[in-house]
Amino acid sequence: SAPYYDDAATKEYNRLNDTNDSVFVMRYFAETANTGNYGNSVAGNLNMDPSGQTVDAQLFFDPGWNQYMYSNTSGRDLHYDAGAMLVPSNAALDYWWNHDGKVLQNMYGSWDNVPIKVLVKMMNINMINTFSETVPSKFNNIVDNTTKVPLGVTTSDVDSCFMGCNGVIYLTNKVFTPADYSSVSFPALVNQNTMSVIYWAIENLNFEPYLNSMDSYYSFITPTNNAMLSYVDPCSYAASKTVLYTFFYDDKAKTVKAHRYYYDLDSGSIDTSTSLSDATGDQVKDRLEDLLNGLIIVGNVEDGHSYYKSKGGSPIHVTNAGVVGSMTVAGGLQLERSKHVIINKIYDQSENGNGKAYVVDDNIPLTSKRSTYNILQKDERYSEFFKLLDGSRGSLISQKLSGTYSCVDYNISLFDAYNYTVYVPTNESIMKLITDGYLPTWDDYEKLTVDDFGGDRKAYNNGRNTLADIITNFLRYHIQDNSVFIGGNIMNNVKFETSKINPLNKRFFSLTVNADDNSLSVEDQLGNMRNVTKQSGLYNNIGREYWFQVSGSGTSAVDQIYNASDVVVNQIDGPLFYEQNQLRPWRAVIGLSTNGAKLSKAGRK
Protein backbone atom coordinates (compact mmCIF):
# COMPACT_ATOMS: atom_id res chain seq x y z
CA SER A 1 0.00 0.00 0.00
CA ALA A 2 1.01 3.65 -0.37
CA PRO A 3 -0.40 7.15 0.21
CA TYR A 4 -1.72 8.79 -2.98
CA TYR A 5 -2.32 12.51 -3.33
CA ASP A 6 -6.02 13.27 -3.94
CA ASP A 7 -6.49 16.65 -5.59
CA ALA A 8 -10.29 16.72 -5.22
CA ALA A 9 -10.11 15.79 -1.53
CA THR A 10 -7.41 18.42 -0.98
CA LYS A 11 -9.52 21.19 -2.49
CA GLU A 12 -12.62 20.17 -0.53
CA TYR A 13 -10.67 19.89 2.73
CA ASN A 14 -9.06 23.30 2.26
CA ARG A 15 -12.43 24.85 1.35
CA LEU A 16 -14.13 23.47 4.46
CA ASN A 17 -11.29 24.31 6.83
CA ASP A 18 -10.04 27.50 5.22
CA THR A 19 -6.50 26.17 5.18
CA ASN A 20 -3.79 25.18 2.71
CA ASP A 21 -2.93 21.53 3.18
CA SER A 22 -2.60 18.32 1.15
CA VAL A 23 -4.76 15.23 1.51
CA PHE A 24 -3.40 11.76 0.80
CA VAL A 25 -5.44 8.56 0.60
CA MET A 26 -4.00 5.20 1.62
CA ARG A 27 -4.57 2.69 -1.17
CA TYR A 28 -3.57 -0.92 -1.64
CA PHE A 29 -1.91 -2.06 -4.83
CA ALA A 30 -4.68 -4.25 -6.23
CA GLU A 31 -6.21 -5.64 -9.40
CA THR A 32 -9.48 -3.95 -8.39
CA ALA A 33 -8.92 -0.63 -6.65
CA ASN A 34 -10.10 2.97 -6.68
CA THR A 35 -8.13 4.84 -9.32
CA GLY A 36 -10.36 7.91 -9.16
CA ASN A 37 -10.46 10.84 -6.76
CA TYR A 38 -12.65 12.09 -3.92
CA GLY A 39 -16.28 12.11 -5.03
CA ASN A 40 -15.53 10.19 -8.23
CA SER A 41 -14.59 6.59 -7.50
CA VAL A 42 -13.32 4.66 -10.51
CA ALA A 43 -12.60 0.93 -10.35
CA GLY A 44 -9.31 0.09 -12.02
CA ASN A 45 -6.02 -1.74 -11.84
CA LEU A 46 -3.67 -0.04 -9.38
CA ASN A 47 -0.26 -1.39 -10.32
CA MET A 48 1.93 1.69 -9.94
CA ASP A 49 3.19 3.43 -6.84
CA PRO A 50 2.78 7.21 -6.36
CA SER A 51 6.07 7.83 -8.21
CA GLY A 52 4.85 5.97 -11.28
CA GLN A 53 6.93 2.82 -10.81
CA THR A 54 5.32 -0.55 -11.52
CA VAL A 55 4.94 -2.58 -8.33
CA ASP A 56 6.09 -6.16 -7.76
CA ALA A 57 2.74 -7.61 -6.72
CA GLN A 58 -0.95 -6.82 -6.30
CA LEU A 59 -3.77 -7.93 -4.05
CA PHE A 60 -6.93 -9.39 -5.54
CA PHE A 61 -8.88 -6.31 -4.45
CA ASP A 62 -8.32 -3.27 -2.23
CA PRO A 63 -9.60 -4.26 1.25
CA GLY A 64 -9.53 -0.62 2.35
CA TRP A 65 -12.02 0.55 -0.28
CA ASN A 66 -15.76 0.24 0.30
CA GLN A 67 -16.81 0.09 -3.35
CA TYR A 68 -14.74 -2.72 -4.83
CA MET A 69 -17.91 -4.80 -5.26
CA TYR A 70 -19.79 -4.99 -8.57
CA SER A 71 -17.62 -2.45 -10.29
CA ASN A 72 -18.79 -3.64 -13.74
CA THR A 73 -22.41 -4.62 -13.05
CA SER A 74 -25.00 -2.01 -13.95
CA GLY A 75 -27.34 -1.08 -11.13
CA ARG A 76 -25.45 -2.88 -8.36
CA ASP A 77 -23.12 -1.55 -5.73
CA LEU A 78 -21.62 -2.47 -2.37
CA HIS A 79 -25.06 -2.74 -0.78
CA TYR A 80 -25.79 -5.99 -2.61
CA ASP A 81 -22.77 -7.93 -1.40
CA ALA A 82 -19.39 -7.68 0.28
CA GLY A 83 -16.09 -9.45 0.22
CA ALA A 84 -14.59 -11.84 2.72
CA MET A 85 -11.15 -12.88 3.88
CA LEU A 86 -9.82 -16.06 5.45
CA VAL A 87 -7.31 -14.86 8.04
CA PRO A 88 -5.31 -17.47 9.99
CA SER A 89 -4.68 -16.87 13.68
CA ASN A 90 -1.15 -16.17 14.86
CA ALA A 91 -0.96 -19.69 16.29
CA ALA A 92 -2.08 -21.24 13.00
CA LEU A 93 0.40 -19.17 11.03
CA ASP A 94 3.26 -20.04 13.37
CA TYR A 95 2.45 -23.74 13.14
CA TRP A 96 2.38 -23.62 9.34
CA TRP A 97 5.64 -21.67 9.24
CA ASN A 98 7.39 -24.39 11.25
CA HIS A 99 5.85 -27.33 9.38
CA ASP A 100 4.35 -27.13 5.88
CA GLY A 101 5.91 -23.71 5.33
CA LYS A 102 9.36 -24.85 6.40
CA VAL A 103 10.69 -24.46 2.87
CA LEU A 104 10.05 -20.71 3.06
CA GLN A 105 11.53 -20.51 6.54
CA ASN A 106 14.68 -22.30 5.40
CA MET A 107 15.01 -20.06 2.39
CA TYR A 108 14.22 -16.67 3.93
CA GLY A 109 14.67 -17.09 7.70
CA SER A 110 11.81 -14.83 8.79
CA TRP A 111 8.49 -13.55 7.51
CA ASP A 112 9.99 -10.11 6.99
CA ASN A 113 12.40 -11.51 4.42
CA VAL A 114 9.81 -13.34 2.31
CA PRO A 115 9.37 -11.32 -0.91
CA ILE A 116 5.97 -9.73 -1.38
CA LYS A 117 5.70 -11.53 -4.74
CA VAL A 118 5.73 -14.83 -2.85
CA LEU A 119 3.50 -13.70 0.03
CA VAL A 120 0.82 -12.23 -2.19
CA LYS A 121 0.04 -15.68 -3.58
CA MET A 122 -1.10 -16.77 -0.12
CA MET A 123 -2.89 -13.52 0.59
CA ASN A 124 -4.88 -13.56 -2.65
CA ILE A 125 -6.09 -17.12 -2.25
CA ASN A 126 -7.63 -16.05 1.06
CA MET A 127 -9.37 -13.01 -0.44
CA ILE A 128 -12.92 -13.73 -1.58
CA ASN A 129 -14.82 -11.16 -3.61
CA THR A 130 -18.32 -12.38 -2.74
CA PHE A 131 -19.54 -12.99 0.80
CA SER A 132 -23.08 -13.97 -0.22
CA GLU A 133 -21.82 -16.91 -2.27
CA THR A 134 -19.36 -18.10 0.38
CA VAL A 135 -21.33 -18.02 3.61
CA PRO A 136 -20.65 -21.09 5.82
CA SER A 137 -23.29 -23.16 4.03
CA LYS A 138 -21.50 -22.43 0.74
CA PHE A 139 -17.86 -22.85 1.84
CA ASN A 140 -17.37 -25.33 -1.00
CA ASN A 141 -17.56 -22.32 -3.35
CA ILE A 142 -14.25 -21.00 -2.01
CA VAL A 143 -11.67 -22.01 -4.61
CA ASP A 144 -8.03 -21.47 -5.51
CA ASN A 145 -7.99 -18.35 -7.65
CA THR A 146 -5.81 -19.95 -10.35
CA THR A 147 -6.95 -23.58 -10.51
CA LYS A 148 -10.59 -22.98 -9.45
CA VAL A 149 -10.33 -26.09 -7.25
CA PRO A 150 -12.14 -25.89 -3.85
CA LEU A 151 -9.83 -25.09 -0.93
CA GLY A 152 -11.72 -27.49 1.31
CA VAL A 153 -12.80 -24.91 3.89
CA THR A 154 -15.18 -26.28 6.55
CA THR A 155 -16.98 -24.61 9.45
CA SER A 156 -14.63 -26.37 11.88
CA ASP A 157 -11.74 -24.45 10.31
CA VAL A 158 -13.28 -21.12 11.41
CA ASP A 159 -12.92 -19.95 15.02
CA SER A 160 -14.53 -16.52 14.76
CA CYS A 161 -16.24 -14.17 12.34
CA PHE A 162 -15.83 -10.38 12.32
CA MET A 163 -18.03 -7.98 10.35
CA GLY A 164 -16.42 -4.91 8.83
CA CYS A 165 -17.95 -2.00 6.96
CA ASN A 166 -16.99 -3.50 3.60
CA GLY A 167 -16.72 -7.23 4.24
CA VAL A 168 -16.27 -10.17 6.58
CA ILE A 169 -13.21 -11.66 8.26
CA TYR A 170 -13.19 -15.39 9.00
CA LEU A 171 -10.54 -16.12 11.65
CA THR A 172 -9.25 -19.60 10.84
CA ASN A 173 -7.31 -22.16 12.84
CA LYS A 174 -5.40 -23.40 9.80
CA VAL A 175 -3.57 -21.87 6.85
CA PHE A 176 -4.95 -22.28 3.35
CA THR A 177 -2.15 -22.11 0.83
CA PRO A 178 -2.22 -21.62 -2.93
CA ALA A 179 -1.41 -24.30 -5.47
CA ASP A 180 1.58 -22.12 -6.40
CA TYR A 181 3.38 -23.37 -3.27
CA SER A 182 3.07 -27.01 -4.39
CA SER A 183 3.50 -26.50 -8.11
CA VAL A 184 6.53 -27.29 -10.27
CA SER A 185 6.67 -23.54 -10.90
CA PHE A 186 7.32 -22.87 -7.19
CA PRO A 187 11.15 -22.99 -7.55
CA ALA A 188 10.93 -20.22 -10.14
CA LEU A 189 8.64 -18.18 -7.86
CA VAL A 190 10.96 -18.33 -4.85
CA ASN A 191 14.19 -17.89 -6.83
CA GLN A 192 13.41 -14.53 -8.37
CA ASN A 193 17.06 -13.49 -8.33
CA THR A 194 17.96 -16.27 -10.74
CA MET A 195 14.67 -17.24 -12.43
CA SER A 196 12.73 -14.00 -12.81
CA VAL A 197 12.56 -14.25 -16.61
CA ILE A 198 10.85 -17.62 -16.81
CA TYR A 199 8.55 -16.84 -13.88
CA TRP A 200 7.43 -13.61 -15.53
CA ALA A 201 6.48 -15.69 -18.56
CA ILE A 202 4.59 -18.22 -16.41
CA GLU A 203 2.66 -15.48 -14.63
CA ASN A 204 1.95 -13.21 -17.57
CA LEU A 205 1.33 -15.67 -20.40
CA ASN A 206 -1.42 -17.64 -18.61
CA PHE A 207 0.68 -20.70 -17.74
CA GLU A 208 0.08 -20.30 -14.00
CA PRO A 209 -3.32 -22.08 -13.94
CA TYR A 210 -1.92 -24.90 -16.09
CA LEU A 211 1.19 -25.50 -13.99
CA ASN A 212 -0.81 -25.20 -10.77
CA SER A 213 -3.11 -28.06 -11.71
CA MET A 214 -2.78 -30.91 -9.23
CA ASP A 215 -4.57 -33.32 -11.57
CA SER A 216 -1.44 -33.90 -13.66
CA TYR A 217 2.20 -34.78 -13.09
CA TYR A 218 4.67 -32.42 -14.74
CA SER A 219 8.34 -32.53 -15.57
CA PHE A 220 9.19 -28.85 -15.97
CA ILE A 221 12.52 -27.88 -17.50
CA THR A 222 13.20 -24.60 -15.72
CA PRO A 223 15.82 -22.26 -17.21
CA THR A 224 17.70 -19.75 -15.08
CA ASN A 225 18.16 -16.17 -16.21
CA ASN A 226 21.62 -17.16 -17.44
CA ALA A 227 20.17 -19.91 -19.63
CA MET A 228 17.67 -17.42 -21.05
CA LEU A 229 20.56 -15.54 -22.64
CA SER A 230 20.88 -18.28 -25.26
CA TYR A 231 17.56 -18.41 -27.11
CA VAL A 232 18.02 -19.01 -30.84
CA ASP A 233 15.16 -17.32 -32.67
CA PRO A 234 13.33 -19.77 -34.97
CA CYS A 235 12.00 -16.86 -37.02
CA SER A 236 15.56 -16.35 -38.25
CA TYR A 237 15.91 -19.91 -39.56
CA ALA A 238 14.68 -18.75 -42.96
CA ALA A 239 17.09 -15.80 -43.03
CA SER A 240 20.73 -15.71 -44.10
CA LYS A 241 21.82 -14.98 -40.53
CA THR A 242 20.62 -16.58 -37.32
CA VAL A 243 19.42 -14.26 -34.55
CA LEU A 244 19.98 -14.78 -30.82
CA TYR A 245 17.63 -13.41 -28.16
CA THR A 246 19.12 -12.60 -24.76
CA PHE A 247 16.14 -12.27 -22.42
CA PHE A 248 16.46 -10.23 -19.24
CA TYR A 249 14.15 -8.94 -16.53
CA ASP A 250 13.83 -5.16 -16.34
CA ASP A 251 13.36 -4.56 -12.63
CA LYS A 252 12.25 -0.97 -13.12
CA ALA A 253 9.54 -1.75 -15.68
CA LYS A 254 8.75 -5.12 -14.03
CA THR A 255 8.76 -6.88 -17.37
CA VAL A 256 10.93 -9.09 -19.55
CA LYS A 257 12.80 -7.64 -22.50
CA ALA A 258 15.32 -9.04 -24.97
CA HIS A 259 18.37 -7.80 -26.82
CA ARG A 260 18.91 -9.31 -30.28
CA TYR A 261 22.19 -10.22 -31.96
CA TYR A 262 23.35 -12.05 -35.04
CA TYR A 263 24.62 -15.45 -33.99
CA ASP A 264 26.78 -18.18 -35.50
CA LEU A 265 25.24 -21.54 -34.64
CA ASP A 266 28.37 -23.48 -35.56
CA SER A 267 30.88 -21.50 -33.51
CA GLY A 268 28.49 -20.21 -30.86
CA SER A 269 29.84 -16.68 -31.35
CA ILE A 270 27.72 -13.53 -31.02
CA ASP A 271 28.16 -10.72 -33.55
CA THR A 272 28.05 -7.49 -31.57
CA SER A 273 29.31 -5.37 -34.47
CA THR A 274 25.90 -5.18 -36.15
CA SER A 275 23.24 -3.24 -34.31
CA LEU A 276 19.86 -4.94 -34.10
CA SER A 277 16.84 -3.36 -32.46
CA ASP A 278 15.64 -4.90 -29.21
CA ALA A 279 12.72 -7.29 -29.48
CA THR A 280 9.30 -5.70 -29.22
CA GLY A 281 6.99 -6.59 -26.36
CA ASP A 282 4.88 -8.74 -28.69
CA GLN A 283 7.97 -10.57 -29.96
CA VAL A 284 9.08 -11.29 -26.40
CA LYS A 285 5.69 -12.75 -25.49
CA ASP A 286 5.48 -14.70 -28.74
CA ARG A 287 8.88 -16.38 -28.27
CA LEU A 288 8.42 -17.03 -24.55
CA GLU A 289 5.03 -18.65 -25.09
CA ASP A 290 6.45 -20.97 -27.73
CA LEU A 291 9.45 -21.73 -25.51
CA LEU A 292 7.35 -22.53 -22.43
CA ASN A 293 5.17 -24.91 -24.42
CA GLY A 294 8.36 -26.80 -25.24
CA LEU A 295 9.66 -26.93 -21.66
CA ILE A 296 6.60 -28.46 -19.97
CA ILE A 297 6.28 -32.24 -20.19
CA VAL A 298 3.11 -33.90 -18.95
CA GLY A 299 4.42 -37.04 -17.28
CA ASN A 300 7.48 -38.34 -15.50
CA VAL A 301 10.73 -38.18 -17.49
CA GLU A 302 12.28 -40.56 -14.98
CA ASP A 303 10.08 -43.50 -16.03
CA GLY A 304 12.79 -45.12 -18.13
CA HIS A 305 12.22 -43.87 -21.68
CA SER A 306 14.33 -41.55 -23.84
CA TYR A 307 11.86 -39.41 -25.80
CA TYR A 308 9.06 -37.32 -24.35
CA LYS A 309 6.62 -34.91 -25.93
CA SER A 310 6.23 -31.46 -24.44
CA LYS A 311 2.96 -29.62 -23.92
CA GLY A 312 3.40 -28.04 -27.33
CA GLY A 313 4.20 -31.37 -29.00
CA SER A 314 7.94 -30.83 -29.43
CA PRO A 315 10.07 -33.83 -28.43
CA ILE A 316 12.67 -33.75 -25.67
CA HIS A 317 15.42 -36.37 -25.49
CA VAL A 318 16.42 -37.33 -21.94
CA THR A 319 19.46 -39.25 -20.67
CA ASN A 320 20.51 -40.28 -17.14
CA ALA A 321 17.15 -39.14 -15.79
CA GLY A 322 17.07 -38.05 -12.16
CA VAL A 323 20.85 -37.76 -11.69
CA VAL A 324 21.89 -34.15 -11.08
CA GLY A 325 24.99 -33.19 -13.03
CA SER A 326 24.80 -36.08 -15.48
CA MET A 327 21.15 -35.91 -16.52
CA THR A 328 20.78 -34.18 -19.88
CA VAL A 329 17.93 -32.90 -22.01
CA ALA A 330 17.99 -32.00 -25.67
CA GLY A 331 15.51 -30.42 -28.03
CA GLY A 332 15.49 -30.87 -31.78
CA LEU A 333 18.10 -28.16 -32.33
CA GLN A 334 20.54 -29.78 -29.90
CA LEU A 335 19.99 -33.24 -31.42
CA GLU A 336 20.73 -31.91 -34.90
CA ARG A 337 24.05 -30.64 -33.62
CA SER A 338 24.85 -33.62 -31.36
CA LYS A 339 24.66 -31.46 -28.24
CA HIS A 340 22.76 -31.59 -24.97
CA VAL A 341 21.88 -29.46 -21.94
CA ILE A 342 22.92 -30.55 -18.44
CA ILE A 343 20.43 -30.53 -15.55
CA ASN A 344 22.06 -28.57 -12.71
CA LYS A 345 19.44 -29.05 -10.01
CA ILE A 346 16.20 -30.93 -9.40
CA TYR A 347 13.37 -29.64 -7.20
CA ASP A 348 11.05 -32.45 -6.13
CA GLN A 349 7.48 -31.16 -5.72
CA SER A 350 5.92 -34.59 -6.19
CA GLU A 351 5.15 -35.51 -2.56
CA ASN A 352 2.56 -32.79 -1.99
CA GLY A 353 2.58 -31.22 -5.41
CA ASN A 354 2.52 -32.07 -9.09
CA GLY A 355 5.96 -33.10 -10.29
CA LYS A 356 9.58 -32.05 -10.53
CA ALA A 357 11.39 -28.97 -11.80
CA TYR A 358 14.64 -29.62 -13.67
CA VAL A 359 16.89 -26.55 -13.65
CA VAL A 360 19.12 -25.75 -16.63
CA ASP A 361 21.69 -22.99 -16.33
CA ASP A 362 23.94 -23.11 -19.39
CA ASN A 363 21.47 -23.40 -22.24
CA ILE A 364 17.85 -24.15 -23.15
CA PRO A 365 16.52 -27.17 -25.03
CA LEU A 366 15.29 -25.64 -28.28
CA THR A 367 13.10 -26.90 -31.10
CA SER A 368 14.32 -28.16 -34.46
CA LYS A 369 15.13 -25.93 -37.41
CA ARG A 370 14.54 -28.71 -39.98
CA SER A 371 11.34 -29.19 -41.94
CA THR A 372 10.19 -32.57 -43.24
CA TYR A 373 11.25 -31.37 -46.68
CA ASN A 374 14.76 -30.61 -45.42
CA ILE A 375 15.12 -33.95 -43.61
CA LEU A 376 14.15 -35.90 -46.72
CA GLN A 377 16.17 -33.77 -49.10
CA LYS A 378 19.41 -34.12 -47.14
CA ASP A 379 19.49 -37.94 -47.02
CA GLU A 380 19.75 -39.96 -50.23
CA ARG A 381 18.17 -42.93 -48.45
CA TYR A 382 14.88 -40.97 -48.53
CA SER A 383 15.24 -39.88 -52.17
CA GLU A 384 12.37 -41.79 -53.83
CA PHE A 385 9.80 -40.64 -51.28
CA PHE A 386 11.24 -37.13 -51.50
CA LYS A 387 10.75 -37.05 -55.28
CA LEU A 388 7.08 -37.87 -54.82
CA LEU A 389 6.65 -35.22 -52.12
CA ASP A 390 8.66 -32.59 -54.01
CA GLY A 391 6.44 -33.07 -57.05
CA SER A 392 3.33 -32.31 -55.02
CA ARG A 393 4.11 -28.62 -54.57
CA GLY A 394 0.93 -26.63 -54.31
CA SER A 395 -1.10 -29.59 -53.08
CA LEU A 396 0.80 -31.25 -50.21
CA ILE A 397 3.70 -28.85 -49.69
CA SER A 398 3.72 -25.08 -49.80
CA GLN A 399 5.87 -22.02 -49.14
CA LYS A 400 2.91 -19.83 -48.17
CA LEU A 401 -0.06 -20.25 -45.84
CA SER A 402 -3.20 -18.29 -46.73
CA GLY A 403 -1.00 -16.19 -48.99
CA THR A 404 0.35 -14.41 -45.90
CA TYR A 405 2.57 -16.59 -43.73
CA SER A 406 6.01 -17.76 -44.83
CA CYS A 407 8.23 -20.69 -43.83
CA VAL A 408 11.85 -21.86 -43.91
CA ASP A 409 11.66 -23.84 -47.19
CA TYR A 410 8.57 -25.98 -47.80
CA ASN A 411 5.97 -27.02 -45.24
CA ILE A 412 3.54 -29.90 -45.46
CA SER A 413 0.19 -28.17 -45.89
CA LEU A 414 -1.62 -31.02 -44.14
CA PHE A 415 0.01 -30.10 -40.83
CA ASP A 416 -2.00 -27.92 -38.49
CA ALA A 417 -0.13 -26.88 -35.31
CA TYR A 418 0.06 -30.44 -33.99
CA ASN A 419 2.63 -33.27 -33.94
CA TYR A 420 2.96 -35.88 -36.66
CA THR A 421 4.89 -38.92 -37.89
CA VAL A 422 5.98 -39.36 -41.50
CA TYR A 423 6.74 -42.95 -42.49
CA VAL A 424 9.16 -43.20 -45.41
CA PRO A 425 9.35 -46.55 -47.25
CA THR A 426 12.81 -47.59 -48.43
CA ASN A 427 13.91 -46.47 -51.89
CA GLU A 428 13.92 -50.09 -53.03
CA SER A 429 10.33 -50.74 -51.98
CA ILE A 430 9.06 -47.58 -53.68
CA MET A 431 11.01 -48.36 -56.85
CA LYS A 432 9.45 -51.83 -56.93
CA LEU A 433 5.96 -50.31 -56.79
CA ILE A 434 6.89 -47.98 -59.64
CA THR A 435 8.51 -50.73 -61.71
CA ASP A 436 5.57 -53.07 -61.16
CA GLY A 437 3.23 -50.37 -62.43
CA TYR A 438 1.27 -49.73 -59.25
CA LEU A 439 2.63 -46.31 -58.32
CA PRO A 440 3.06 -43.59 -60.95
CA THR A 441 5.72 -40.89 -60.77
CA TRP A 442 5.41 -37.21 -61.54
CA ASP A 443 7.33 -37.92 -64.75
CA ASP A 444 4.52 -40.29 -65.72
CA TYR A 445 2.07 -37.50 -64.92
CA GLU A 446 3.93 -34.98 -67.10
CA LYS A 447 4.32 -37.40 -70.01
CA LEU A 448 0.60 -38.05 -70.39
CA THR A 449 -0.77 -36.56 -73.61
CA VAL A 450 -4.20 -36.10 -75.13
CA ASP A 451 -3.16 -38.57 -77.81
CA ASP A 452 -2.82 -41.25 -75.12
CA PHE A 453 -6.60 -40.91 -74.74
CA GLY A 454 -7.43 -40.85 -78.44
CA GLY A 455 -7.76 -37.07 -78.47
CA ASP A 456 -10.40 -37.07 -75.72
CA ARG A 457 -9.41 -34.01 -73.65
CA LYS A 458 -11.91 -34.75 -70.88
CA ALA A 459 -10.50 -38.26 -70.45
CA TYR A 460 -7.01 -36.78 -70.54
CA ASN A 461 -7.80 -34.27 -67.77
CA ASN A 462 -9.49 -36.95 -65.68
CA GLY A 463 -6.50 -39.21 -66.19
CA ARG A 464 -4.06 -36.55 -65.02
CA ASN A 465 -6.19 -35.78 -61.96
CA THR A 466 -6.45 -39.46 -61.11
CA LEU A 467 -2.70 -39.91 -61.45
CA ALA A 468 -2.07 -36.96 -59.12
CA ASP A 469 -4.57 -38.41 -56.63
CA ILE A 470 -2.84 -41.81 -56.67
CA ILE A 471 0.48 -40.20 -55.77
CA THR A 472 -0.83 -37.73 -53.18
CA ASN A 473 -3.09 -40.31 -51.53
CA PHE A 474 -0.12 -42.67 -51.26
CA LEU A 475 1.79 -39.87 -49.51
CA ARG A 476 -1.16 -38.91 -47.32
CA TYR A 477 -1.44 -42.42 -45.93
CA HIS A 478 2.19 -42.25 -44.82
CA ILE A 479 1.51 -39.14 -42.71
CA GLN A 480 0.10 -39.89 -39.27
CA ASP A 481 -1.27 -37.72 -36.48
CA ASN A 482 0.90 -37.92 -33.34
CA SER A 483 4.66 -38.27 -33.22
CA VAL A 484 5.86 -41.74 -32.22
CA PHE A 485 9.41 -42.75 -31.37
CA ILE A 486 11.59 -45.72 -30.68
CA GLY A 487 12.33 -45.04 -27.02
CA GLY A 488 9.13 -43.08 -26.45
CA ASN A 489 5.90 -44.18 -24.80
CA ILE A 490 5.23 -47.91 -25.07
CA MET A 491 2.35 -48.60 -27.47
CA ASN A 492 0.43 -51.82 -27.96
CA ASN A 493 -1.85 -51.86 -31.00
CA VAL A 494 -2.61 -48.15 -30.77
CA LYS A 495 -4.55 -46.77 -33.73
CA PHE A 496 -3.68 -43.37 -35.18
CA GLU A 497 -5.38 -41.48 -37.96
CA THR A 498 -3.52 -40.66 -41.16
CA SER A 499 -4.10 -37.76 -43.54
CA LYS A 500 -5.98 -39.92 -46.06
CA ILE A 501 -9.78 -39.73 -45.84
CA ASN A 502 -11.93 -42.77 -46.53
CA PRO A 503 -14.46 -41.48 -49.10
CA LEU A 504 -17.05 -44.02 -47.95
CA ASN A 505 -17.41 -42.85 -44.35
CA LYS A 506 -15.57 -39.49 -44.50
CA ARG A 507 -13.25 -40.63 -41.72
CA PHE A 508 -9.48 -40.84 -41.89
CA PHE A 509 -7.88 -44.19 -42.59
CA SER A 510 -5.86 -45.41 -39.62
CA LEU A 511 -2.59 -47.17 -38.88
CA THR A 512 -1.90 -49.49 -35.94
CA VAL A 513 1.34 -48.83 -34.07
CA ASN A 514 3.39 -50.96 -31.69
CA ALA A 515 6.42 -49.36 -30.08
CA ASP A 516 8.84 -49.85 -27.21
CA ASP A 517 12.33 -48.73 -26.29
CA ASN A 518 13.96 -50.83 -29.01
CA SER A 519 11.59 -51.08 -31.95
CA LEU A 520 8.57 -49.62 -33.73
CA SER A 521 6.21 -51.33 -36.16
CA VAL A 522 3.17 -50.11 -38.04
CA GLU A 523 0.33 -52.10 -39.60
CA ASP A 524 -1.72 -50.82 -42.54
CA GLN A 525 -5.34 -51.45 -43.58
CA LEU A 526 -4.36 -54.54 -45.59
CA GLY A 527 -2.60 -56.18 -42.66
CA ASN A 528 0.93 -55.45 -43.85
CA MET A 529 3.31 -55.08 -40.90
CA ARG A 530 6.17 -52.64 -41.54
CA ASN A 531 9.14 -52.15 -39.25
CA VAL A 532 11.08 -48.97 -38.66
CA THR A 533 14.64 -49.23 -39.95
CA LYS A 534 16.82 -48.88 -36.88
CA GLN A 535 19.90 -47.45 -38.56
CA SER A 536 21.60 -44.18 -37.72
CA GLY A 537 19.84 -41.27 -39.38
CA LEU A 538 16.80 -43.30 -40.43
CA TYR A 539 14.62 -43.17 -37.32
CA ASN A 540 13.55 -40.60 -34.72
CA ASN A 541 14.47 -37.79 -37.11
CA ILE A 542 12.96 -34.73 -35.44
CA GLY A 543 11.74 -31.71 -37.36
CA ARG A 544 9.53 -28.68 -36.93
CA GLU A 545 7.62 -26.66 -39.47
CA TYR A 546 6.97 -22.99 -38.71
CA TRP A 547 4.68 -20.45 -40.25
CA PHE A 548 5.96 -16.92 -39.73
CA GLN A 549 4.22 -13.59 -39.87
CA VAL A 550 6.64 -10.87 -40.97
CA SER A 551 6.19 -7.12 -41.29
CA GLY A 552 8.89 -4.63 -42.25
CA SER A 553 12.31 -5.50 -43.59
CA GLY A 554 16.00 -5.51 -42.73
CA THR A 555 17.25 -5.34 -39.16
CA SER A 556 14.02 -3.68 -38.01
CA ALA A 557 11.68 -6.37 -39.37
CA VAL A 558 9.11 -7.56 -36.85
CA ASP A 559 8.44 -11.28 -37.07
CA GLN A 560 6.12 -13.56 -35.12
CA ILE A 561 5.58 -17.31 -34.93
CA TYR A 562 2.07 -17.77 -36.34
CA ASN A 563 2.05 -21.50 -35.58
CA ALA A 564 4.31 -24.54 -35.69
CA SER A 565 3.94 -28.29 -36.20
CA ASP A 566 6.31 -30.94 -34.93
CA VAL A 567 7.24 -34.02 -36.90
CA VAL A 568 9.32 -37.17 -36.60
CA VAL A 569 10.47 -39.00 -39.73
CA ASN A 570 10.90 -42.78 -39.54
CA GLN A 571 11.97 -45.02 -42.40
CA ILE A 572 10.01 -48.27 -42.76
CA ASP A 573 10.93 -51.41 -44.68
CA GLY A 574 7.94 -51.31 -47.04
CA PRO A 575 5.03 -49.17 -48.24
CA LEU A 576 1.68 -48.82 -46.50
CA PHE A 577 -1.68 -49.41 -48.20
CA TYR A 578 -5.16 -48.26 -47.21
CA GLU A 579 -7.09 -50.31 -49.79
CA GLN A 580 -6.62 -53.21 -52.20
CA ASN A 581 -7.35 -50.96 -55.17
CA GLN A 582 -3.89 -49.42 -54.77
CA LEU A 583 -2.52 -52.68 -56.16
CA ARG A 584 -4.17 -52.16 -59.54
CA PRO A 585 -1.88 -50.99 -62.37
CA TRP A 586 -2.24 -47.24 -62.62
CA ARG A 587 -2.49 -47.38 -66.41
CA ALA A 588 -5.53 -49.61 -66.08
CA VAL A 589 -7.05 -47.26 -63.51
CA ILE A 590 -6.99 -44.35 -65.98
CA GLY A 591 -8.08 -46.49 -68.93
CA LEU A 592 -4.78 -47.03 -70.73
CA SER A 593 -3.19 -50.23 -71.97
CA THR A 594 -1.02 -52.05 -69.43
CA ASN A 595 1.20 -53.58 -72.11
CA GLY A 596 4.82 -53.45 -71.05
CA ALA A 597 4.04 -52.94 -67.38
CA LYS A 598 5.46 -55.55 -65.05
CA LEU A 599 2.76 -56.65 -62.61
CA SER A 600 3.27 -58.58 -59.36
CA LYS A 601 2.00 -58.97 -55.80
CA ALA A 602 3.81 -55.86 -54.59
CA GLY A 603 1.60 -55.27 -51.59
CA ARG A 604 2.57 -58.41 -49.70
CA LYS A 605 6.33 -58.18 -49.93
Features from the language model and the residues they span:
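Mature, structured domains of secreted/extracytosolic soluble proteins
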Residues: S1-K605
